[in-house]
Design a protein with these regions (language model features):
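Short, small-residue-biased leader/transition segments that mark boundaries at the very start
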Residues: 1-2
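Beta-rich accessory regions
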Residues: 7-18, 24-259
Length: 259
């Protein structure tokens, strides 16, 4: 049996990050379609600054189809069983971000593995986002650029990034197009990835942070983004920011994750 794409010139990405590859589905999950991707990139997988391992699997995701603007897409939502890993919970009351809003300590016992679950109302803001950072100033920026309809994750200052200078581009990427389509491109590791989004009033965002990764799931997995990061110590502080107006964080829970 031969399958042909009805739109060979249209790419619908399952994940918009740099480090989602070789997705494998399980065959014994009943009516559910559950997949696990490899979390790395052939551009730099052999030179990442790790000792005990070179790569790992990302979180298992449940795949499903949905329709948007008369187009069919594949969503990838974290499987609900991940909730059993939640240990400590920190619930932060609703707040408005007019310029910035600081959270000086995310979790009391933070070893670098946690989940952030947020519900956001856009308001008048053009840019709305937050930085996860540590005492050394290493940070990851995650933000919505609403005029350009983009969700962005910027890891250019996330920690150890200089090994990216030795990245080897894929054969199809030897031209410079990847440099112009990325945001804040420094090299094939130090950059920002982005996903197209619909401009909506409310967004639900799940962010999973581990010792060397950040995985984003927007609106139940309609957008997923997986990126490696290598901070020298866990991100335990947070700063929300806005430009062009304010936005509202209606719900915000932080969970320490563990076995």
């Amino acid at each position: 049996m031969l399958f042909r794409s009805s739109q060979p010139n249209v790419t619908k990405w399952l994940d918009w990050g740099k480090d989602h590859y070789a997705t494998v589905c399980f065959s014994n999950t009943g009516e559910r379609t559950i997949a696990v991707p490899w979390m790395s990139n052939w551009q730099y997988c052999n030179i990442v600054p790790t000792k005990q391992f070179r790569s790992a699997n990302a979180l298992p995701r449940e795949l499903s189809l949905y329709t948007q603007d008369n187009e069919i897409y594949l969503s990838a939502a974290p499987v609900p069983e991940i909730k059993t890993l939640r240990k400590e919970k920190k619930e932060i009351p609703a707040f408005t971000v007019a310029n910035d809003y600081h959270i000086d300590s995310l979790l009391a016992d933070n070893d670098g593995a946690y989940e952030l679950a947020l519900e956001i109302t856009a308001g008048e803001a053009e840019i709305m986002g937050f930085s996860l950072f540590n005492d050394k100033g290493e940070k990851v920026d995650i933000y919505f650029n609403l005029p350009e309809k983009r969700l962005v994750m910027d890891r250019t200052k996330s920690g150890i990034v200089d090994f990216g200078k030795k990245s080897v581009p894929h054969e199809i990427e030897v031209h410079d197009r990847r440099k112009t389509t990325s945001i804040n491109y420094i090299d094939d590791f130090a950059l920002a990835t982005w996903a197209p989004i619909k401009k909506e009033n409310k967004y639900m965002l799940d962010v999973f942070v581990d010792k060397c990764s950040v995985e984003i799931f927007l609106n139940g997995g309609k957008v997923a983004m997986t990126n490696l990061i290598f901070p020298s110590e866990p991100y335990n502080r947070m700063c929300f920011y806005s430009k062009g107006g304010s936005f509202q964080v209606d719900s915000f829970n932080a969970y320490r994750l563990g076995l």
